[in-house]
Swiss-Prot record:
Name listed for the protein in its UniProt record: Cerebellar degeneration-related protein 2-like
Keyword hit for Oxidoreductase: no
Residue stretches of biased makeup (Pro residues): 399-409
Cited PANTHER family: CENTROCORTIN FAMILY MEMBER, CEREBELLAR DEGENERATION-RELATED PROTEIN 2-LIKE
Domain of life, source organism: Eukaryota
Gene, per the UniProt record: cdr2l
Annotated family: Belongs to the CDR2 family.
Organism encoding this protein: Danio rerio (Zebrafish)
Keyword line: Coiled coil
Chain intervals with Basic and acidic residues compositional bias: 384-395
UniProt-annotated stretches for the region Disordered: 371-419
Coiled coil: 31-154, 201-264, 342-379
Length: 464
């Protein structure tokens, strides 16, 4: 009879609820709030992804525009290179022509110097001959005057008249005697030499005039060459300015290439960020993992110290999520490689629906786990002992009146056992935080990190 009383106390103790309804409601409210927060965060991520798509399209258009500009600059550079080649060829030809003209000008200058020396020498000869002619003229005048004086003296003498009558007639009235005829014979070679000198002087003057004309022509050619040289210098300055412009365009092209490389790096960084966002998203459980979780839940239900239904379910799911997240990330990467054309918004939407399904499945697992725990309590309350007296007690149980309300245990052993169980549960709850809290904390930290990365990339774009 005493044994039957102890069995009744054990049954009443096992019939008491092992969890608190408030804890369950608080867990459900917390899960609902977290789901709402995740929905809001999902909307924000959708907006940010749309903005990223718009920015990506703008950057693609800008890259196309820059590529077109690069092609135009490349064509302009090629045209400038062709012009520079032509200018180089023209400059070389002009340098050769300039060298030839310089040599010709030097030769003409030497010739002019020689002709100038010849002119000076001839001018000296002309001066000497002119002085000699003047001297001969003075001598001739003196001789004529002397003859006139002599003729005046002898004009009234008879022999002179006889000589005049007998002498041959001369056209020159002043030459009336033989000595005068000798003077004329001496003057004829002087006149011939004088004529010859006059001819030489006239020829020299003609040569000097011709040389002066040639000199003026050479001076005009030198002036034309100098003008051409100045024009070539101006063209050379223009070519140097064009060369500087080409260097500036090359520097701008290098800057544009560096800017393009930096933008490509930024675009690749944003793609990596999107990939990390997708990889960090939770994945759905496989059926095998669900079975393993249910088996784990059943084993946990048999433990002497039980967790709440949400704690045990989330422990099982988080234990499965460690491998499922890795497999899911690999599967997501493979799907991303196979279906690169799929939109990221669609993937996020699918992940959101998968998260909702996972949440509903979590609630279903909690309910199933609660029912399994109830069945386990009923099963553990029955096989207490294999004594035939217990069978008699079980047969006699339907004949007993309904059980009385539960009473507080009166024995010290029962009190000590209950206190030990309560202390163990408190110690476990104080040491081990629930797994879902750590999971949600990790999710929020990753969301904040992605938001800070997006803001930093936008700040870098704005700074550039």
């Amino acid at each position: 009879m005493l044994r039957a009383g102890r069995m009744d106390e054990f049954v009443t103790e096992e019939d008491e609820p092992w969890y608190d309804q408030r804890d369950l409601e608080q867990d459900l409210h917390l899960a609902a709030e977290l789901g709402k927060t995740l929905l809001e965060r999902n909307k924000e991520l959708e907006d940010s992804l749309q903005q990223m798509y718009i920015n990506n399209e703008e950057q693609v258009q800008e890259i196309e525009y820059l590529t077109k500009q690069m092609e135009m600059l490349r064509e302009m550079n090629e045209q400038h290179a062709k012009v520079y080649e032509q200018l180089d060829v023209t400059a070389r030809e002009l340098e050769i022509t300039n060298e030839k003209l310089v040599l010709e000008s030097k030769g003409s200058q030497q010739k002019i110097d020689r002709l100038t020396g010849t002119m000076e020498m001839l001018q000296g000869q002309v001066d000497t001959l002119t002085a000699r002619v003047e001297e001969l003229r003075t001598l001739e005048e003196l001789r004529v005057r002397r003859e006139k004086k002599e003729r005046r003296k002898t004009v009234h003498s008879f022999p002179c008249l006889k000589e005049l009558c007998t002498a041959p007639r001369y056209e020159d009235s002043f030459m009336v005697s033989d000595p005068g005829s000798g003077d004329l014979e001496e003057c004829q070679p002087a006149d011939e030499e004088n004529e010859h000198l006059r001819v030489m002087v006239s020829s020299l003057r003609a040569a000097v005039a011709a040389e002066r004309g040639r000199r003026e022509a050479a001076e005009r050619e030198c002036a034309a060459v100098l003008q051409e040289f100045e024009r070539l210098e101006q063209r050379l300055l223009g070519a140097e300015s064009c060369q500087r412009r080409v260097h500036e365009l090359e520097a701008e092209l290098q800057e544009m290439q560096q800017l393009r490389k930096s933008r490509v790096c930024l675009l690749s960084g944003e793609e990596g960020l999107e990939q990390t966002l997708l990889n960090c998203a939770p994945e759905t459980d496989t059926p095998d993992e669900a079975v393993m979780a249910q088996n784990g839940d059943a084993n946990d239900g048999a433990a002497p110290v039980r967790k709440s239904c949400s704690d045990t379910a989330l422990d099982a799911i988080s234990a499965v999520d460690a491998s499922g997240r890795r497999k899911g990330s690999y599967a997501l990467h493979a799907n991303g490689v196979r279906k690169r054309g799929m939109s990221i918004l669609r993937e996020v939407d699918e992940q959101y629906h998968a998260l909702l399904e996972k949440y509903e499945e979590l609630l279903g697992k909690c309910r199933r786990h609660e029912e399994s725990l109830r069945h386990a309590e009923v099963q553990t309350s029955r096989p207490v002992s294999r004594d035939p007296s217990m069978k008699e007690c079980r047969v006699a149980e339907p004949q007993q009146p309904p059980p009385t309300p539960p009473q507080t245990p009166s024995t010290p052993e029962a009190l000590e056992g209950i206190s030990r169980q309560v202390e163990a549960v408190d110690k476990r709850l104080s040491q081990n935080t629930p797994e879902y809290k750590a999971l949600f904390k990790e999710i929020f930290s990753r969301l904040q990190r992605t938001k800070s990365d997006i803001n930093s990339t936008k700040g870098r774009k704005g700074g550039k």
